[in-house]
C-alpha cells in the first residue's frame, strides 16, 4: 500500500509506461513524486544512482526505465540494448537496496513472452515459446 505522503520515484517517467504511472499517481492525489531526466541522472552510472537515491530517500520506486527501440534497432544493436538495460536495472535495484528503499516495483517487457502468444497474455506464458529476436 502506498500511503498518501509517500515519496515515490518513477524511473523512466518520460516513457510510455512511466508517463502513465505519473498520471495515475497524480490522479490518485500523490504529491511527492520524484523524477529525473537523463540530463539530471544517468541510470547507467552506479555512483550517480546511489547518490540520487540517498539524497531523495524515496519510499517507493517504480522501475520503468529502459533503452528502447524498434525490432530493427533491437536486432542490429542487441548487445548495446542488453548492456544498457542490465546496467539500469542493476544500478536502480542495488541502489534501492543500499539506500534502504523498502518498496520497488520492476516492470518487465512484453518481449519476455512468446512472440505469437495467445491473447490476452497470461503470466504462465512467460518464456514458454520463441521470443522476439
Describe the function of each predicted region.
Residues 2-28:
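N-terminal Rossmann NAD(P)H-binding glycine-rich loop of SDR-like oxidoreductase domains
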Residues 7, 31-32, 102-103:
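Residues at the starts of beta-strands that form the adenosine-phosphate
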Residues 23-27, 54, 94-98:
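Short, well-ordered alpha-helices that flank and scaffold nucleotide-derived cofactor binding pockets
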Residues 26-52:
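Adenosine-cofactor binding site in Rossmann-like domains, unifying the SAM/SAH pocket
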Residues 46-86, 98:
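NAD(P)H-binding glycine-rich loop region in Rossmannoid oxidoreductase-like domains
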Residues 76-94, 98, 102-103, 111-133:
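Catalytic helix-loop patch of NAD(P)-dependent Rossmann-fold dehydrogenases
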Amino acid at each position: 500500500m502506498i500511503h498518501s505522503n509517500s515519496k515515490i520515484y518513477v524511473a523512466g517517467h518520460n516513457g510510455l509506461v512511466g508517463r502513465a504511472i505519473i498520471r495515475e499517481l497524480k490522479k490518485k492525489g500523490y504529491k511527492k513524486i520524484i523524477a529525473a531526466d537523463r540530463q539530471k541522472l544517468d541510470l547507467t552510472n552506479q555512483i550517480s544512482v546511489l547518490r540520487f537515491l540517498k539524497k531523495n530517500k524515496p519510499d517507493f520506486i517504480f522501475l520503468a526505465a529502459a533503452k528502447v527501440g524498434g525490432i530493427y534497432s533491437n536486432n542490429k544493436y542487441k548487445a548495446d540494448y542488453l548492456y544498457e538495460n542490465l546496467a539500469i536495472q542493476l544500478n536502480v535495484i542495488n541502489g534501492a537496496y543500499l539506500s534502504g528503499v523498502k518498496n520497488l516495483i520492476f516492470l518487465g517487457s512484453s518481449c519476455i513472452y512468446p512472440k505469437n502468444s495467445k491473447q490476452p497474455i497470461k503470466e504462465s506464458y512467460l518464456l514458454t515459446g520463441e521470443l522476439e529476436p
